[in-house]
Amino acid sequence: YFMGNTRFGLWIFDAIRLHRRLGINVILPVLPFHGPRKAGRFSGEGFLGGSLVDTVHAEAQSVWDLRRLLGWIRALDAPSIGVHGVSLGGYNAALLAGIDDGLSCVIAGIPPVDLARLVWTHAGPTVVGSLERAGIDRDAVAELWRVVSPLAVAPKVPFARRAIYAGIGDRLVSADHPRDLWEHWGRPRIVWTQGGHDPRTSEARRLVVEM
C-alpha cells in the first residue's frame, strides 16, 4: 500500500530493484481515501479522522480490494504471492494475513495494530475531549474497531513466513504496537531498525529481500 504518489511509492518499496534484480513482480495498490481515491483535500483524510464507522468501512474496503487483487493474480497462475505493507499498509498486511490462507509470506512494516490507541495518542486533547464528552471512550472505540483488527484474527501465513520490522525511534507508531503484533503472531522474526517511521533503512530492506 502507498499514499497514491507513484514515484514515491516505487521508491518507498524499492520496487524497481526488486523487479530488476530479483525478478519479482510488484503491485502497489492504493488505500481507500488516499491518492486518486481521496475524498477530502488531503490524501488519507477521512480514513481515521471522520466518522468512527467510516474507519470500519475503509478497512473492510481495503481488505476487499486486496482479496480481489489476489484473486486476479492467482488467475494469472502466479507461483507465489507475498504481501508487504508499511504503516497503515502494515496494519492491513497483518489483517490480511489472518484472512487469506494462500499467502507465501507477509511482512508488516512499522505497523500500528491498535487504531484506537493510535488516535488517543496523537489526536490531541480537542478531538479526544470531544469524543469523551459525547460518552465515547477509548475502550468503546477499540471495541468498535476490533472487527477489523489484526489482533482479532489468527495468522494463516506459515510461522516462518511472517516477519515484522519497526523503528526503535518511531514516534508515530510506538514500539508497543509492533511488539503486540509480534506476541499475537507467536513471536516470529522481528527486526528493530535504527530509525523512526522509515521503511527505507538497510535493516528493513535486507529483511524484505530475505523473505
Predicted features along the sequence, with ranges:
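Active-site signature of alpha/beta-hydrolase-fold catalytic machinery across serine-
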Residues: F13, L95-I99, D180
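Alpha/beta-hydrolase active-site loop
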Residues: F42-L76
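Alpha/beta-hydrolase fold nucleophile elbow
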Residues: R74-S87
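Short, surface-exposed "cap/lid" segments of acyl-processing enzymes
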Residues: Y1-R41
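Conserved alpha/beta-hydrolase "nucleophile elbow" surrounding the catalytic nucleophile
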Residues: G85-G90, G167
